[in-house]
Swiss-Prot record:
Main location: cytoplasm
InterPro entries: Enolase-ppase_E1, ENOPH1_eukaryotes, HAD-like_sf, HAD_sf
Cofactor binding remark: Binds 1 Mg(2+) ion per subunit.
Tagged with keyword Metal-binding: yes
Residue positions binding Mg(2+): D16, E18, D193
Gene: UTR4
Organism ancestry: Eukaryota, Fungi, Dikarya, Ascomycota, Saccharomycotina
Residues binding substrate: S131, S132, K167
Catalytic reactions on record: 5-methylsulfanyl-2,3-dioxopentyl phosphate + H2O = 1,2-dihydroxy-5-(methylsulfanyl)pent-1-en-3-one + phosphate
Pathway: Amino-acid biosynthesis; L-methionine biosynthesis via salvage pathway; L-methionine from S-methyl-5-thio-alpha-D-ribose 1-phosphate: step 3/6; Amino-acid biosynthesis; L-methionine biosynthesis via salvage pathway; L-methionine from S-methyl-5-thio-alpha-D-ribose 1-phosphate: step 4/6
GO molecular function: acireductone synthase activity; magnesium ion binding
GO terms (BP aspect): L-methionine salvage from methylthioadenosine
Designated name of the protein: Enolase-phosphatase E1
Enzyme class, UniProt record, top EC level: hydrolase
Length: 233
């Protein structure tokens, strides 16, 4: 088993974030609440109709027109997206902008697992990130890691639902393979806490394994047959 793990990590690696390299609670209990707390202070400065010259207004102008009438409509709509965990690219862009403020002023620090830090900083093979969060938000997270670490110099690239598609669709993984130079799919391994994402990557020809961390969702016996790890060796 250890030999098999070493062989997997001697390959190009693509990592999910939430529940894979950092606790799922960081996103649900820290990032999402912080975003919601900052909504009113940020949106209260907007002028309606929205002035696209303003970065926040420019993002909000991409939401459906019927929610752009006033601050209350915008906040209600955005809160609904967050509550339903909708993978909306416009929402992800706005979250990234808000989280940047939090990371920059020290309110937010990413609790990346120690074993994930070790993998990212010592791997001789390329490591990429694929998350539903925007590429901008991914870069913020990995550049503001506990211990005052910046892991971005060790990462080869980033992908999100805007660049590559949704994570439960096998064509998204084929798109990533094309973007990283069309390596043989079986030489690339994807790690995620989501069985559906792992299945999609396998369908695209990649190797893929489920990462089991504290707080992650339960797995069925069928899920476990896909292969699991509890940490990166």
């Amino acid at each position: 088993m250890k030999t098999e793990c070493r062989e997997l990590f001697a390959m190009t690696v693509i990592l999910d974030i939430e529940g894979t390299v950092c606790p799922i609670t960081f996103v649900k209990d820290t990032l999402f609440p912080y975003f919601l707390e900052q909504l009113h202070p940020i949106l209260s400065s907007l002028q309606f109709p929205l002035d696209k010259a303003d970065p926040v207004a420019n993002i909000c102008s991409q939401f459906p027109s019927h929610v752009q009438q006033d601050e209350t409509s915008l906040i209600t709509y955005i809160r609904q997206l967050v509550a339903s965990d909708t993978k909306d690219p416009v929402l992800k862009s706005l979250q990234g902008l808000v989280w940047k403020k939090g990371y920059d002023n020290g309110d937010l620090v990413a609790p990346i697992y120690d074993d994930a830090i070790a993998l990212i900083t010592t791997s001789s093979e390329p490591i990429y990130i694929y998350s539903s969060g925007s590429v901008a938000a991914q870069k913020l997270l990995f550049s503001h890691v506990k211990g005052n670490l910046d892991l971005t110099p060790h990462l080869a690239g980033y992908f999100d639902i805007t660049t590559s598609g949704h994570k439960q669709d096998s064509t998204s993984y084929k798109s990533i393979l094309h973007a990283i130079g069309n390596p043989e799919p079986a030489t690339v391994t994807f790690y995620s806490d989501s069985p559906a994402e792992v299945r999609a990557a396998i369908e695209a020809g990649m190797k893929a394994t489920i990462v089991v961390r504290p707080g992650n969702g339960p797995l069925t016996d069928q899920d476990r047959q896909l292969g699991t790890i509890t940490s990166f060796p």
